[in-house]
């Protein structure tokens, strides 16, 4: 009986086996080739496998390299922030899951803080969502609000994940550039880079679902003026368009400039998601905590994405962040408040970088906010003929050469551009200056020695 059943099973399986073998022979496919077709990537990530941060962080990982590339502070976070985390780690129930949309004490602190700027009550449970960094906020917003076939306006240069996330949602990024209009007799500043109102208006149509705004801007350091934001707001209202406002550098604004929140403009609260970051606020990028603020009718869709992906964020980190916020909320007019002390500290570092670059004949774009500075390296005489991949933009090859030969890391600015505009920015590199004085000293030594060699 058993043998008969075994033969029957063998016979019943054989046609399927023969069919598979026959197909393989006819198509000339090996088993590995068949598997590669079977397990090919999903279309939504087609062409998105290359990543500037993965590639250049790896190159700069050598301890001998002075890393002014990735926006990675090597200054110490505030002492009280670290102390709060240390205390909280010892509390048993704060090492377990918390509320999926944001730890209660943290959303309450965020509500209290931002009500001072929005001039209206913010419901901590319905109008704030705590996420895995600002990346998480962007992902939730785009996945929760953008549909296949929609168009999303992206301002060039842009933080690289904007384009990738829009494409993963099946939408089409529509690019509009910031254009430089320098003022005679004045150092080139990030404020010289502006949108052409008519060009911007031409990008809006019935398919436009959203515009992604970034102020203060990465990589330029541009802080949008009230008048510039009003132009964007008027177009959003006219075309019934959402605004995803990435404001992670909101506290890092330098003398003579002011940060405005577009969500506070008439008619914009109901159509705006505003994004913030713990990493940029308290110099704790490794904590990977961010938040989205907006009206309930928008935030609820971001909550749906979060509850079906990451579900919740780390409880101890959220509680420590909440306590850190309460400390600074109580002293916002005090120079010791980190929201006030950090930009003052960084403005000194910014000015140092500007002076250093000028001293060796390099033009820079002086940032009005953020902690990056862009330098024009076209005047440096560098032989890049030995670089392997000749198809890469000049700035990619330049930075790789600089890491290898000068032990100094930066980020190529063309990484922040769409394919059509890369050539306009390929002679620029971005340096990060939220660094210890000793790190900046080492960078200065490298740059000045390099300049002496070329003179």
From Swiss-Prot:
<dbReference type="GO" id="GO:0005739">
    <property type="term" value="C:mitochondrion"/>
</dbReference>
<dbReference type="GO" id="GO:0006520">
    <property type="term" value="P:amino acid metabolic process"/>
</dbReference>
<dbReference type="InterPro" id="IPR015424">
    <property type="entry name" value="PyrdxlP-dep_Trfase"/>
</dbReference>
<feature type="modified residue" description="N6-(pyridoxal phosphate)lysine">
    <location>
        <position position="280"/>
    </location>
</feature>
<protein>
    <recommendedName>
        <fullName>Kynurenine--oxoglutarate transaminase 3</fullName>
        <ecNumber>2.6.1.7</ecNumber>
        <ecNumber>4.4.1.13</ecNumber>
        <ecNumber>2.6.1.63</ecNumber>
    </recommendedName>
</protein>
<keyword id="KW-0456">Lyase</keyword>
<dbReference type="Pfam" id="PF00155">
    <property type="entry name" value="Aminotran_1_2"/>
</dbReference>
<dbReference type="GO" id="GO:0047315">
    <property type="term" value="F:kynurenine-glyoxylate transaminase activity"/>
</dbReference>
<dbReference type="GO" id="GO:0005737">
    <property type="term" value="C:cytoplasm"/>
</dbReference>
<feature type="binding site">
    <location>
        <position position="430"/>
    </location>
    <ligand>
        <name>substrate</name>
    </ligand>
</feature>
<comment type="subunit">
    <text>Homodimer.</text>
</comment>
<keyword id="KW-0007">Acetylation</keyword>
<keyword id="KW-0663">Pyridoxal phosphate</keyword>
<comment type="similarity">
    <text>Belongs to the class-I pyridoxal-phosphate-dependent aminotransferase family.</text>
</comment>
<keyword id="KW-0808">Transferase</keyword>
<dbReference type="GO" id="GO:0070189">
    <property type="term" value="P:kynurenine metabolic process"/>
</dbReference>
<comment type="function">
    <text>Catalyzes the irreversible transamination of the L-tryptophan metabolite L-kynurenine to form kynurenic acid (KA), an intermediate in the tryptophan catabolic pathway which is also a broad spectrum antagonist of the three ionotropic excitatory amino acid receptors among others. May catalyze the beta-elimination of S-conjugates and Se-conjugates of L-(seleno)cysteine, resulting in the cleavage of the C-S or C-Se bond.</text>
</comment>
<dbReference type="GO" id="GO:0009058">
    <property type="term" value="P:biosynthetic process"/>
</dbReference>
<feature type="binding site">
    <location>
        <position position="218"/>
    </location>
    <ligand>
        <name>substrate</name>
    </ligand>
</feature>
<keyword id="KW-0032">Aminotransferase</keyword>
<dbReference type="InterPro" id="IPR004839">
    <property type="entry name" value="Aminotransferase_I/II_large"/>
</dbReference>
<comment type="pathway">
    <text>Amino-acid degradation; L-kynurenine degradation; kynurenate from L-kynurenine: step 1/2.</text>
</comment>
<dbReference type="InterPro" id="IPR015422">
    <property type="entry name" value="PyrdxlP-dep_Trfase_small"/>
</dbReference>
<feature type="modified residue" description="N6-acetyllysine; alternate">
    <location>
        <position position="116"/>
    </location>
</feature>
<dbReference type="GO" id="GO:0030170">
    <property type="term" value="F:pyridoxal phosphate binding"/>
</dbReference>
<feature type="binding site">
    <location>
        <position position="71"/>
    </location>
    <ligand>
        <name>substrate</name>
    </ligand>
</feature>
<dbReference type="InterPro" id="IPR015421">
    <property type="entry name" value="PyrdxlP-dep_Trfase_major"/>
</dbReference>
<dbReference type="InterPro" id="IPR051326">
    <property type="entry name" value="Kynurenine-oxoglutarate_AT"/>
</dbReference>
<dbReference type="GO" id="GO:0016212">
    <property type="term" value="F:kynurenine-oxoglutarate transaminase activity"/>
</dbReference>
<dbReference type="GO" id="GO:0047804">
    <property type="term" value="F:cysteine-S-conjugate beta-lyase activity"/>
</dbReference>
<feature type="modified residue" description="N6-succinyllysine; alternate">
    <location>
        <position position="116"/>
    </location>
</feature>
<dbReference type="GO" id="GO:0097053">
    <property type="term" value="P:L-kynurenine catabolic process"/>
</dbReference>
